[in-house]
Regions:
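Short, glycine-/Ser/Thr-/acidic-enriched flexible segments
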Residues: 66
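A surface-exposed, charged beta-strand/loop segment in the N-terminal or early-internal portion
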Residues: 74
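Aromatic-anchored, charged helix-turn/loop surface patch used as a conserved interaction hotspot
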Residues: 77-82
Length: 275
């Protein structure tokens, strides 16, 4: 695992705080499976689901329980939460922001996934960001490469009235856009040859695809098949895909469907299958 950021450890030590660890079982499947088999010292936030679902869901645990699992730093799907609140209060707060007020809801926000968490922060209202941030002195999440970063929290004013966790229509649309590149990269992960400049760095991969999608959507592309084809082209093309996409004859001609696929075929350079 990667080291915790020094700013996080210094803040915890200077203020005599303890940490809780929030884990995404879908991103850390071996750990999620172990927790589902031996949950002592940890809380499944999917408590009402079958064991298989709990294994893939979010888990909240003490620092000691995390250490017993070998968690001593940052990795994808692992979050360190510094708070003065009790574990029970943290659990309640996380459940509220993951599923809303409806305890029977099957629509969950993946707060333990750093990608999803940052996407949500980008679409929440100011009041929502402040209400979510209230319990945390610090929140350390891992980026797409597993490196630790501190979440930008909002503590400028106190929330005096309840704040809805619901997303409006425009927020939902913005969230879909914010998560689109990750979703398409995931779908194509075993199907697309990867350019050598993108191997070993998921952040570069995401940046290249997201920039290509932004230009394509600005040019009028909205069909998911077309956007998937352009994502595959970006993954084959590499880090210079954002500068090359505007020059593509296929985009200039507004090609779509099979014509776009045929035009993009062979456009990319040195590609290697990889993850």
């Amino acid at each position: 695992m990667n080291r915790l950021p020094k700013h996080y450890t210094h803040l915890v030590e200077a203020n005599g705080l303890s940490s809780l660890v929030l884990l995404d079982g879908a991103m850390q499947q071996s750990l999620g499976t172990r927790l589902a088999e031996q949950p002592e010292g940890a809380i499944s936030l999917f408590a009402n689901y079958p064991k298989a679902a709990r294994a893939l869901g979010p888990w909240l645990m003490s620092e000691a329980r995390a250490a017993s699992l070998g968690i001593d730093g940052c990795a994808r799907g692992i979050n360190w939460l510094a708070s003065e609140c009790s574990m029970a209060d943290v659990e309640a707060h996380l459940l509220l922001w993951m599923r809303g007020q409806d305890s029977a809801s099957r629509r969950w926000q993946r707060l333990a996934d750093g990608r999803a968490l940052n996407a949500l922060l980008s679409v929440w209202t100011v009041a929502q960001r402040h209400a979510f941030s209230h319990p945390w002195r610090a929140w350390c999440y891992a980026d797409r490469n597993g490196a630790g970063h501190l979440l930008t929290l909002a503590h400028k004013f106190e929330i005096l009235t309840p704040v809805s966790t619901d997303l409006g229509r425009e927020q939902q649309s913005a969230l879909m856009r914010a998560t689109l590149a990750d979703a398409l990269i995931h779908e194509l992960r075993t199907l697309t040859a990867l350019h050598s400049s993108l191997k070993g760095c998921r952040e570069k991969r995401h940046a290249a695809v997201d920039a290509v999608l932004a230009q394509a959507m600005a040019a009028g592309y909205a069909d998911m098949t077309d956007l998937s084809a352009l994502t595959a082209w970006a993954l084959r093309t590499g880090t210079d895909a954002p500068t090359r996409v505007a020059e593509l004859p296929a985009l200039q001609q507004q090609l779509s469907g099979s014509e776009l696929l045929d035009a993009l075929d062979g456009e990319a350079g040195d590609a290697e299958v990889g993850s």
